[in-house]
Amino acid sequence: MIQHPRIGIRPTIDGRRQGVRESLEVQTMNMAKSVADLISSTLKYPDGEPVECVISPSTIGRVPEAAASHELFKKSNVCATITVTPCWCYGSETMDMSPDIPHAIWGFNGTERPGAVYLAAVLASHAQKGIPAFGIYGRDVQEASDTDIPEDVKEKLLRYARAALATGLMRDTAYLSMGSVSMGIGGSIVNPDFFQEYLGMRNESVDMTEFTRRMDRGIYDPEEFERALKWVKENVKEGFDHNREDLVLSREEKDRQWEFVIKMFMIGRDLMVGNPRLAELGFEEEAVGHHALVAGFQGQRQWTDHFPNGDFMETFLNTQFDWNGIRKPFVFATENDSLNGVSMLFNYLLTNTPQIFADVRTYWSPEAVKRVTGHTLEGRAAAGFLHLINSGSCTLDGTGQATRDGKPIMKPFWELEESEVQAMLENTDFPPANREYFRGGGFSTRFLTKGDMPVTMVRLNLLKGVGPVLQIAEGYTLELPEDVHHTLDNRTDPGWPTTWFAPRLTGKGAFKSVYDVMNNWGANHGAITYGHIGADLITLASMLRIPVNMHNVPEEDIFRPKNWSLFGTEDLESADYRACQLLGPLHK
């Protein structure tokens, strides 16, 4: 069984015996235990289990103890370290020198012992050696006997741990391409060097004929298929057919296509993660899957011109339930856009919640909305908004029908209630696909995302000569008056899922206006997650050495390794680019 990645906690100490070290042992080890307790009681893995920490076998005062800690961590699948100390220690003798995992150091802010002095010294050693480390230093002085972790320190410890765990969860997994390049979209030109060097992932690929092979040869669970078909008939609403009359399929053909798309879902899932049931049926090779943490399906146009499209498959893979009940979502990209798939993956690993995949389709200015609908925008919509709409698929969690404290939310699967599942299904229908675009048919997903949800839109882009760059836009979903929504929505495809999004403006740069956000967006797709997680994304990007070219995160929330400040403190964007370029990818 594959172990969860763990956080290693390193209590470092003044190595002087005969009084000094002995007086600090209990306080130092208690710091380590309190950090481990904070992380394990607050953070969860994507499967809902508490995050595991490993504490060094002893306090670390000299090199042999640092080496013993390193050996333990290697055996324990430690993906990142947090060093803690209340006192002076010997900097380069006690530091962890692993170059391929993130490091953080918390130096206790107290007057009795110089924990802050050690913090500064060891961070200088990290900078000298080219091994980045995050520095954590509480704003307020604490008493030596105080065992509480200050709130500002907690925030940084948890931000670091969330991002560090994401690096560990990605390592040694795969991106699975189902098909190849869709309609010339750059993001679906999969770059294996990026996956290997920045994420520690490998790439796998299957031709889309693998779907028809498995259907024709019965390489799926027939019992599950019958159960799935019954569930779909009882729970999934077929929507209005918007096709012109000569393109409307017969009832018999639509029924056949429902069976087809259910099989597509089962096969897509089995390709990603395997299915032991297939081995029982005699298909041992297919049963193991591809160890894929994220995948994408090309679809257009070679598949969709002939077969039912992938919308149903993509929708339910990204959703946290199906006929087998509530479960964690898969991360699955439309049009095999691997870069949007990775954007979704970053969001998912930081939040444990499902992701909206959408076209960043239209900027609606207040003037244009007024001209088309007669409505004057106000509130969060006053400066205009973006129409986020995918061409037929989206996680049903994106409806916003789950709630917390009476407000719409996208929540982890272990919090999801059966009543919320039913609400998502009731507020979604599945119209026959637009056969002018999808000649082979299929069924799209249609819903409207509820308003007033805090969300973050993210996109990873590849820039020749630079490499990957990340852009982030925090904002809110909107609920427009019903007639306004219908007027605007019907100008695109009324059979597709819509989210109205207003980014938070800052008055400068790419966030001077909503138009500027649209104009500076790097690609046609975006990954949208619940919550304002821009600060976590910036921390994760710095660990992977991916510069951020556009964000609206308050400066006081930005948390990067300490040596980033040595590249400049006034122009943080420029310093980020220089640091990432000099240090290079995490796994190179």
Swiss-Prot record:
It is an enzyme of class 5 (isomerase). The keyword Chloroplast does not apply. Mn(2+) binds at residues 335, 359, 525. Pfam families: Fucose_iso_C, Fucose_iso_N1, Fucose_iso_N2. One of its GO terms (biological process) is L-fucose catabolic process. It is found in: Cytoplasm. Its EC number is 5.3.1.25. GO terms for molecular function: arabinose isomerase activity; L-fucose isomerase activity; manganese ion binding. Keywords: Carbohydrate metabolism, Cytoplasm, Fucose metabolism, Isomerase, Manganese, Metal-binding. The active site is at residues 335, 359. Its main location: cytoplasm. Transmembrane segments: none annotated. Converts the aldose L-fucose into the corresponding ketose L-fuculose. This is L-fucose isomerase.
